[in-house]
Amino acid sequence: VGQGDTVEAQCRSALETIRGAVEQAGSSFEKVVRVNYYLPDGAEFEPCWPILAEAFGANPPAATMVECNLIDPKYRIEIELTALA
């Protein structure tokens, strides 16, 4: 999950945190093969598309969006991904 009051801000923040972790592990977003997105309101996923397209480029990884409650109501999106080494 990321910081911010909107789903867009939290999406950007989460991706920045994840990018740092992926790069520290010796990989990159170009090597991401799978992403899971968890949102309490599936309708909020659409505003994230431009942010995700910018992050993953022309060949995005396989993805699943799950509508579910998150640990705290202030969180609008949680992102989980798998990247190759």
For the regions a language model picked out, list residue spans one by one.
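Short, polar/acidic, helix-capping and beta-turn segments at strand->helix junctions
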Residues: V1-A85
